Amino acid sequence: MTDSFDYKQLTAHLPPPVFVPLPGYLPQTPEAMLASAEQFHADMARRRTTRDFSTQAVPRRLIELAMLTAGTAPSGAHRQPWRFVAIDDPAIKAQLRAAAEAEELKTYRSRMPLEWREALHPLGTDHIKAHMTDAPWIVVLFAEKFGIQADGSQRKNYYVDESVGIAAGLFIAAIQMMGLVTLTHTPNPMAFLRELLGRGANERAVLLMPVGYPAANAQVPDLQRLPAQAIIQWNVSAG
């Protein structure tokens, strides 16, 4: 093909894209924008991964809103390849915990290399996962590797990991803004989650997130976030 080739000819058989006015945009003054941004940063700066949960009930609507917020994430070709499964049934949570602890015990005993053990040591983790039954909710995030169309054929999804990662971030932010806490738990391996929750072969478990209120005596590791100069650069080029 030459440089003059019109690539739009390749989709000429499809109807033209449909566009609508940008919905819901609300202009703000620079002062209001700065105040909102600073408040959001302050709220998120208080976020900590938490393993000590209260058993206090959390309304289902809050969990639903967090998942719906996650569903507003951008995605490759707008495929929206995320699927959330929310569980508050004590029997199912106990089943998930037993399966997770069985896998984690194998990991801590023999699968985990020394470098990984040393990296996890400051977090004080082990194979006991009480948070899975203490927290009132468990939300499992699955990535849809490919879609299944009405005729049973596969539909390719694009940038699945990136899209699902963004959705996870929005979910975590929503939980934080509600005054709840969560933990991004990644049992290794995670195939048991798909099997126990009856998900399709086209889905892959990405995160298991207990959600709830922190326990009255909740503690977190004494860790520090990287300073701005370590994670941000301005106008840097190789030239």
Model-based region annotation:
Residues 59:
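Conserved, non-catalytic sequence blocks in retroelement Pol enzymes and Pol-derived host proteins
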Residues 2-32, 36, 126, 207-239:
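C-terminal helix-cap and adjacent tail motif
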Residues 2, 13, 80-164:
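Glycine/small-residue-rich phosphate/adenosyl-binding loop
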Residues 104-112, 198-221:
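A glycine-rich helix N-cap at a beta->alpha junction
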Residues 67-70, 139, 145-196:
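Small-aliphatic-rich amphipathic alpha-helix that forms the alpha element of a beta-alpha
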